[in-house]
Amino acid sequence: MTKSIPRIGSRRGGRIASRKNARRIPKGVIHVQASFNNTIVTVTDVTGRVVSWSSAGTCGFRGTRRGTPFAAQTAAANAIRTVIDQGMQRAEVMIKGPGLGRDAALRAIRRSGILLSFVRDVTPMPHNGCRPPKKRRV
């Protein structure tokens, strides 16, 4: 009878959770991009590496419902839920875009319990750059 050879690369004694979740992030930056059609919430650490993200589309909203304030609130809550588990306590918020979800996303971030050091509007404003598209005639 032969002896069984122990497998070196077996996962029996190893950890099952991914290494990404084990990272502790005490401070981060929450980027909210609110367009008229969708709202994207991205959470990064202070160096700029993406930790978590969510959008109204990934939360299950389709079509015109993606641009609603409720969809933005849901997207912000989804993105923040994962980083709170990783130990985030303080954050800075950068809001970009003219969409309806700006205020709703900020409200959801405030309700989450993360201390906000500042909220900054980083919407790009042209200094009379490109010619805008013609007005719609409906």
UniProtKB/Swiss-Prot annotation:
InterPro entries: Ribosomal_uS11 (IPR001971), Ribosomal_uS11_bac-type (IPR019981), Ribosomal_uS11_CS (IPR018102), Ribosomal_uS11_sf (IPR036967). GO terms for biological process: translation. GO terms for molecular function: rRNA binding; structural constituent of ribosome. Keywords: Chloroplast, Plastid, Ribonucleoprotein, Ribosomal protein, RNA-binding, rRNA-binding. Residues 9-21 have a biased composition (Basic residues). It is found in: Plastid, Chloroplast. It comes from the Eukaryota. GO terms for cellular component: chloroplast; ribonucleoprotein complex; ribosome. Signal peptide: none annotated. The keyword Phosphoprotein does not apply. Residues 1-21 are annotated as: Disordered. Belongs to the universal ribosomal protein uS11 family. PANTHER family: 40S RIBOSOMAL PROTEIN S14/30S RIBOSOMAL PROTEIN S11. This is Small ribosomal subunit protein uS11c.
